[in-house]
Amino acid sequence: MHTAKPVKRYFNLKSSRIGMNPQTKTFEGAINRLNSLQSNAKVLEVLRKRGKIPNDQSMVEMRHWLRCIGYQPSDLNRLNVIHVAGTKGKGSTCAFTSSILQQIQKSGERSIPKCIGMYTSPHLRSVCERIQLNGKPISQELFTKYFFDVWERLENAVGSDSEKPMYFRFLTLMAWHVFISENVDAAIIEVGIGGEYDSTNLIEKPYATAVTSLGLDHTSLLGNTIAEIAWQKAGIYKESAIALTCEQAPEAMNVLKNRAAERNTSLKVVIPPAELTPDMIGLSGVHQLGNTSLAVSLVQEFYEKAGCPFDRDPYQDPAILDGLKYVKWPGRCQIEEINNIKWCFDGAHTKESLEATGLWLASKKNLYEDADARILLFNQQSRDDPIALLRSFLKGLESSGTGISFTHVIFSTNVTWKDAGYNPELLSINTITDNKPVLHVQEDLCKWWKESKGTTSEATVAPTIQEAIETVMSIKQKSRNTFVCVTGSLHLTGGVFVVLDQAVF
């Protein structure tokens, strides 16, 4: 078994001084400080029970933090922002958009963009992945430089002992600082959660906005109906840009239309053209066609705003076609052969995304039809109804009538190592209580599987990803051919890449 060596744990989760050492300006020090800005599972549970949801005050606070690091919201306009919200596919849409712009940049046919920024979440292996320049994660050196720029500006503004913005807010501030400092002239920004009150929604005059496919997710924060969620997501629509979306449920579409009208803009529904086929794009899955066509429309709107619109069908443009073909977005319908095992990685973590993953996997029968060991490695930790998510995956898998029958199912936490705990850049305090991983979610999933599937497969719980991989390797030793599907969360997918020591970018 080839796995990466556990990395030294940099922190003690029980310490009130988490992340404050070493004091030197190193990447390790930056990660320590960043991790100190997370909330643990107990705090998040209290907030959920209180019904504390994002509101206007969230944006007041974010504007305050932006001013503390030396910027006004109007300063963000120079980045020519493409802003993307949605439940399913917003990350892929951002990746397609960035890839197209990179190919246009490479062609030299247009004067813009000279520097492309992209901000997405979460990351797979390294937090550097969240902030990209020209299609590549920023280096650890650049991350360290800009991290401490922001950290020290905040301390100078409010004092070293004052409360700082939480993890995602801090990284959002840092992304703005990186992009402005590096003279980015096309910034693709993925919303974290929702839209109206999301930390990214300080942009006053975006070049283009889009809401991808909608579904029920983060209901404790965004609302219990598709209409409520649509209202939140459409909060990114602004008067300065056409409001784009894809085909939606009628109740969602009505809300999007009304929200666009409120912002004095018009809603444009993008439908994949007949000439766009799965073999033209670099990410697997029929569900990517909608994300692809949204990305193409975002690029069109970007250049309309820049004053140099396309004068031909974009699907006949070589640079756009190359952007679709050469897109790189790891951990999404990704197939690899590692240690003589066929692996399928997909970080789907919503009902809609997991159903789409199941449908895609059912269409890839050649991956597992000869395998006598067929393993599902699944993780869910923080969503409202993890069993419903697992059911959605199985629904997609079984809907074709030719779905895979798993011989083994492993429900794992997203803790990386059994001795060292989390890999520092994968730390997720919001799934930890008293320095221990929260296992009850995995135990509930395992119990449901056993009750629903009986003895058709062997179901177990793994306290860490390392132990889950050890179980996979043990099964492999007794099998001729082994297939593993890793899904349920990007945190699990990234952790498996770490344990298997696989590069992402």
UniProtKB/Swiss-Prot annotation:
**Could you mention a single GO BP entry for this protein?**
tetrahydrofolylpolyglutamate biosynthetic process
Gene3D superfamilies, alphabetized = Mur ligase, C-terminal domain, Mur-like, catalytic domain
Q: Which UniProt keywords apply?
A: ATP-binding, Cytoplasm, Ligase, Magnesium, Membrane, Metal-binding, Mitochondrion, Mitochondrion inner membrane, Nucleotide-binding, One-carbon metabolism
Where in or outside the cell?
Mitochondrion inner membrane; Mitochondrion matrix; Cytoplasm
User: Where along this sequence does the record place binding of ATP?
Assistant: G89, K90, G91, S92, R332, D346
Cofactor(s) demanded: a monovalent cation
Q: Which family does it belong to?
A: Belongs to the folylpolyglutamate synthase family.
Protein name as it appears in the record: Probable folylpolyglutamate synthase
Species of the source: Schizosaccharomyces pombe (strain 972 / ATCC 24843) (Fission yeast)
Q: Which gene encodes it?
A: met7
